[in-house]
């Protein structure tokens, strides 16, 4: 069996509801007169954030900023959102279906503004009004989000809120790890804004979730290959599966060759650490 391990060395924090945490970030940032910039994956995560924002407005979890603008600035996210809006009951959970049955659009609310053209995108940063900006790519490696970072990283009143995993070597990871100077479009940018993270929102299961999935097999796997994680995490999760649950587990590095028919390794190289950008 091959299993991913993105969060194989930790448990997701579910103590505080994500809606409450997001509302706190919006409140704090708008109170300062800044922009809340959310690097977000275009499909799935952006729509999830819109769902939370609708709930925040409905429950009035942000005060003093009625109708605060929310810009969705990603062509792919806009197309994906349109598809979500056309989906039937089979695509939603019970809570969302109840909203649809009540005539409530689950991912739409007043104040949402769709940015289509590059001119629309540029106009967002020309508008001094405090706002929420959802833009891709989620790890800040490409896309319109990089322009919004250029205009907000240096502002003490703004916030960059990560809502998904940031892979090692990406700009998002460097910001999350606390880097104070980055280069965007050939310009050195000082990072003065607040950097935040919304925990538990990854589409990847944590250690317990992954272990529960493995336990679902009627017959225990003979060998578990652990991949899709940083080197330290894949090694740690493979070790955890062996020592705590009795699996024969292995975290292969790039170039490893295993003969399934013979049940043995043909090539087993050592790992090469990822260099930071």
Task: Describe every region a protein language model picked out.
Residues 2-277:
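Acidic/His-rich, metal-assisted hydrolase cores and their charged scaffolds
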């Amino acid at each position: 069996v091959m299993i991913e391990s993105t969060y194989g060395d930790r448990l997701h924090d579910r103590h505080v509801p994500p809606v409450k945490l997001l509302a706190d970030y919006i409140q704090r940032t708008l109170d300062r007169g800044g922009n809340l910039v959310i690097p977000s994956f275009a499909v799935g995560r952006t729509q999830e954030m819109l769902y939370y924002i609708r709930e925040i407005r409905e429950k009035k979890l942000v005060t003093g900023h009625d109708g605060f603008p929310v810009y969705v600035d990603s062509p792919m996210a806009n197309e994906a959102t349109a598809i979500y809006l056309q989906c039937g009951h089979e695509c939603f959970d019970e809570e969302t279906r109840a909203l649809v049955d009540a005539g409530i659009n689950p991912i739409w609310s007043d104040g949402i503004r769709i940015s289509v053209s590059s001119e629309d995108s540029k106009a967002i940063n020309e508008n001094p009004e405090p706002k929420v900006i959802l833009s891709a790519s989620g790890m800040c490696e490409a896309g319109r989000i990089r322009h919004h970072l250029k205009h907000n990283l240096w502002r003490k009143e703004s916030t960059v809120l990560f809502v998904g995993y940031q892979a090692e070597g990406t700009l998002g990871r460097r910001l999350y790890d606390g880097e104070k100077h980055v280069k965007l479009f050939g310009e050195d940018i000082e990072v003065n804004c607040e950097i935040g993270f919304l925990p538990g929102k990854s589409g990847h299961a944590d250690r317990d979730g992954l272990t529960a999935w493995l336990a679902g097999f009627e017959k225990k796997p003979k060998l578990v290959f652990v991949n899709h994680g940083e080197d330290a995490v894949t090694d740690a999760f493979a070790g955890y599966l062996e020592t705590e649950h009795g699996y024969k587990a292995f975290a292969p590095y790039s170039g490893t060759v295993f003969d399934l028919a013979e049940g043995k390794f043909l090539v087993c190289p050592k790992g090469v650490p990822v260099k930071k950008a």
